[in-house]
């Protein structure tokens, strides 16, 4: 096989082409072996993925976590073999047996790429469009990171300068989340982001003419992106030279994200399956796989054929990666020498440590005063923001309501934005009314590393964010969601804005910790605990959702046990508790008032505040039993939402004061009264439970 380059701009040899074709047959074989999967896109995209991994990206397969690396996101996650074949060829740790085990129990090659499971996979993708927003978040994080550590460096000269590459398919760009994120990227002028669109005109139901007719390239131009179209080769295959040249041109446009439309033919060069919807999501069949191998010059009788010459050639990526990293290390060391204080800060942040004495900055709120927990959260953020520079975030256009602004004078916006507070390295992110992409961008920001991000909206709009929140949990990402206006207590905006099912629904997501503090002091402790729990170590981190009130609620003495998720806020007087009242958030003060009535009538009553069911469940059985004694069968849970969470805690004799229907437009106090969230009703329900327990 000739190794002589065929052009001067891109060194591309016959051996490179053989490696691309090897990736194609590996994709076809892997799907054929397991009997299911998505071969077509992996076959047609092989030249683009190979060009990125072997010719373009700065990365070191031996150190997939290298800070200076370029990032790659496969938004079209169903085409996971596009990524797996390149990870194998480049030497990231996958071997041929891993490709043979594609989509099987315990393999390193699951059906869709999973972060933390396979080395070299930067994010979990599969739900279409999520990866586009993840990539936008990574590009945002790269800019903020540069602002933390090297803001004065000339463009392209900082060790913190790198690119984010994303491959997206037709489906990704049909999803609304990609429109939200792409609009954000254009507005932010993210010149470090390059998106390659696999324009193959095929979806599951056939040609994309079934559902789409707009000019996608013009749409991206309207978003403010730099756009290019590249034509395929005369035979229909993707042209590596055109891809390489387009990427090089994109890199030079530093004030816009770049969109490269690649017209492709799905499953190329399969003689019968190419350009058909059948090639999208099912095995080609033995005959078609054999026919494809003949077209490409492979032995149709062999499966998973990789020559020593090919793997020897592609594994040179390890040498190039080591050289690139060594070169980067020089510039990084020079930066460290010239910036010792920033270098110390970088070391602290990259270890996930917080500044010495940060906890002392947390506000302590005076008991008795009525403070909305959203307002308390805002005070906490402003206090912590002063000492934790890596903490940044914003809101989906509800900053004044969510109380999510650390610094009103510093907005994360391009330098030429007309607003006076615009700063490319600003503290406050204006996500816009784009809740779904906000959540996925926060995932990308967190995956990128070296910052801590939060984002806010109303709790009811967490529905818009749900798939991205689920992926936060699936990836164990320490993202913080600030969800305010958390119940009917928000009042007159009515049932469209009043969360009812949301708390229970969010608690149903495995790995998401929902925290609903009772008052200002619990809110401060919640933020402290969330920050202490922050870790990027896979499997140990977790996203948190803070559910905060619009309305003022009484402030109680701070109790450190709030960090354990549930604790005895007020103990029974006059003997062992006969009844336990369990409440969260704004309903805790209702339970406290009900306790006073019960105590006055001679019923020793304990009040348990349970800001986080998930944190409480982490505690040992002894602690949980000390809070909720098994011997006390009379229990009442009080929460202004559906009661699904509480059945396991109240037991057979227990009762739940909940809301099993939508709310109404009226003052929040009126709604609490009309729907039974009063001390009188809770006390009456407690007596019912007591009677049931004594039967």
Where are these regions (language model features)?
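Thiamine diphosphate
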Residues: 2-163, 314-318, 322-543, 547, ...
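Short acidic, Gly/Ser-rich segments with clustered Asp/Glu that frequently serve as metal-coordination loops
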Residues: 171-177
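Residue-level marker for buried hydrophobic side chains located in beta-strands
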Residues: 166-167, 195, 394, 516, ...
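Intrinsically disordered, low-complexity segments enriched in small/flexible residues
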Residues: 170, 279, 365-366
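Non-catalytic, alpha-helical, charged scaffold/linker segments
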Residues: 293-298, 303-324
């Amino acid at each position: 096989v000739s190794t002589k380059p065929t052009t001067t701009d891109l060194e591309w040899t016959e051996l490179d082409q053989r490696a691309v074709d090897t990736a194609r047959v590996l994709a076809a074989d892997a799907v054929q072996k397991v009997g299911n999967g998505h071969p077509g896109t992996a076959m047609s995209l092989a030249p683009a993925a190979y060009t990125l991994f072997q010719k373009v990206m700065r990365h070191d397969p031996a150190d997939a976590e290298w800070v200076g690396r370029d990032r790659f996101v496969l938004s079209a996650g169903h085409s996971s073999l596009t990524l797996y074949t390149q990870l194998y060829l480049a030497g990231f740790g996958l071997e041929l047996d891993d490709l043979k085990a594609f989509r099987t129990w315990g393999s390193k090659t699951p059906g869709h790429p999973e972060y933390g499971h396979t080395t070299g996979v930067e994010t979990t993708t599969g739900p279409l469009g999520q990866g586009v927003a993840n990539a936008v978040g990574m590009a945002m994080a790269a800019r903020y990171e540069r602002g933390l550590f090297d803001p004065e460096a000339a463009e392209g000269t900082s060790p913190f300068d790198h690119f984010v590459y994303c491959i997206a398919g037709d489906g990704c760009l049909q999803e609304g989340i990609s429109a939200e994120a792409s609009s954000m990227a254009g507005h932010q002028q993210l010149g470090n982001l390059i998106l390659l669109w696999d324009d193959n005109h095929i979806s599951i139901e056939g040609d994309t003419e079934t559902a789409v007719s707009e000019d996608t390239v013009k749409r991206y131009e309207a978003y403010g992106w730099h756009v290019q179209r590249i034509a395929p080769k005369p035979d229909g295959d993707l042209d590596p030279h055109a891809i390489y040249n387009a990427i090089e041109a994109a890199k030079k446009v530093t004030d816009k994200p770049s969109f490269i439309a690649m017209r492709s033919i799905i499953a190329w060069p399969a003689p019968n399956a190419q350009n058909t919807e059948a090639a999208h999501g099912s095995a080609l069949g033995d005959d078609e796989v054999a026919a494809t191998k003949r077209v490409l010059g492979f032995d149709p009788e062999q499966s998973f054929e990789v020559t020593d010459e090919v793997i020897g050639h592609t594994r040179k990526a390890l040498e190039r990666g080591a050289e690139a990293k060594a070169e980067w290390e020089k510039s990084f060391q020079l930066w460290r020498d010239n910036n010792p204080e920033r270098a110390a800060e970088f070391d602290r942040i990259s270890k996930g440590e917080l500044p010495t004495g940060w906890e002392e900055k947390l506000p302590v709120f005076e008991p008795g005063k009525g403070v909305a927990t959203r307002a308390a959260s805002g005070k906490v953020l402003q206090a912590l923001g002063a000492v934790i520079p890596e903490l940044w975030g914003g809101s989906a256009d509800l900053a004044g309501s969510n109380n999510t602004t650390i610094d009103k004078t510093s907005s994360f916006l391009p330098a030429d934005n007309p607003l006076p507070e615009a700063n490319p390295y600003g503290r406050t992110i204006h996500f816009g009314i784009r809740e779904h992409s906000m959540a996925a961008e926060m995932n990308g920001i967190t995956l990128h590393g070296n910052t801590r991000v939060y984002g806010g909206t109303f709790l009811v709009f967490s529905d818009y964010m749900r798939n991205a929140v689920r992926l936060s949990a699936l990836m164990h990402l320490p993202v913080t969601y600030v969800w305010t206006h958390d119940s009917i207590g928000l009042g007159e905006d009515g049932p469209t804005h009043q969360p009812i099912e949301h708390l229970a629904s969010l608690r149903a997501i495995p790995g998401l910790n929902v925290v609903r503090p009772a008052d200002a002091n619990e809110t401060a402790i919640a933020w402290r605990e969330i920050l202490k729990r922050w870790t990027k170590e896979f499997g140990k981190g977790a996203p948190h959702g803070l559910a905060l009130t619009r309305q003022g609620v009484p402030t109680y003495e701070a109790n450190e046990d709030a960090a354990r998720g549930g604790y005895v806020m007020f103990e029974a007087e006059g003997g062992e508790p006969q009844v336990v009242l369990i409440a969260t958030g704004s309903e805790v003060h209702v339970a406290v008032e009900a306790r006073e009535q019960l105590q006055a009538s001679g019923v020793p009553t304990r009040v348990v505040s349970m800001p986080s069911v998930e944190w409480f469940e982490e505690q040992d059985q002894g602690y949980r039993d000390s809070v909720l004694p098994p011997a006390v069968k009379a229990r009442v849970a009080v929460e202004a939402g559906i009661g699904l969470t509480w059945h396991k805690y109240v037991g057979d004799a227990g009762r739940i004061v909940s809301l099993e229907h939508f709310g109404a437009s009226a003052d929040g106090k009126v709604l609490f009264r009309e729907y039974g969230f009063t001390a009188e009703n809770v006390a009456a329900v407690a007596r019912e439970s007591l009677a049931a327990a004594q039967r």
